[in-house]
Amino acid sequence: MRRPSAPRASALRALAHRASAVLAGTLLLAALAAPAAAPAAYAAPATAYAASAAAGDENFTIKDPRITESSGLAASRQHPGIYWTHNDSDDGPYLYAVDSRTGDTVARLTLTGIGTPRDVEAISIGPGNRIVVGDIGDNLDGTWPYVWIYELPEPRELKDATVKATQYEVTYADGARDAESLLVHPKTGRVYIIDKKEDGGHLYAGPEKLSVSGRNVFKPVAPIDLWATDAALSPDGQRLAVRGYFGGIDYDWNNGVPKRVARLNVPLQRQGESVTYSADGTKLMYGSEGESSDVQARDARGAAGKGSNSSSDGGSSTGAGKDGDGTSGGTVKVGAVALAVACAALFGVSRVRRRR
């Protein structure tokens, strides 16, 4: 990723916070490695699970050694069981199609017709099987006067190919900012972005239709109570899932003014960066960065018409912290110990930063 020569203090804080989150995630995973008895969480009906498993919508590992910073995830509706992903930065104009049944890459697309990507953070699929990619990251917290969105048709045949994409220039009505979450409404095709702020950000709505002439101004329409690393709309456009490093929030879409419903039981991962609904909407698939990164499936609210993997908070904007607790059932005790260790580590890191 290209960066200015003189980073600002706020930018350094943002990078330090991200490093702290990764450290905490590592400590949490280590602590949770110990076995713990836990009652079974909600399980979708067997018929729904069987169908989902047949499509590959279950846990898998991304095996491709070229994918070391999987920062976005999108389920293909045209190719069941296939998930599109990309690296965070310093990789080039590439998208990867991963078969969730095997973890193998079955296609790599090289995008043409665009500039050099800076910090690609998100991917989504809209109506007509149009892939939309968000080159919207800004680790220097508002350095770039504009960011980019790329749009391309999803190939009907999965193989390595060069695909021409359309590039859109994007600005924000209230100034430049960092963002890692992009979503496309599955019915209208309208593009939305959620900015990434530690104390919570906003949902930004783009124009009804993006334009290649001039800049597309995204406007804030609703607050999001999360330090968001990714978000996804359900295939029917009725639900919004937003995740952070250690938790997430389940919203009703509510015609573009999201209404908080519950906390999401987000799995603990090395560096939780991505989320997408499975093509049939019964699963939420959570991805992580790193070599051989894992993608973990959880039942989505309303899976097969029953149940939820969310913890209701009555629509509250608080609950167990802005990121949620990411725990459930018998894992709470072990998670509490892990969280204490992680908090101690984060406290130490913050003290070191203050002394500097």
Predicted regions and their residues:
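Sequence/structural signature of beta-propeller domains
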Residues: 2-21, 25-356
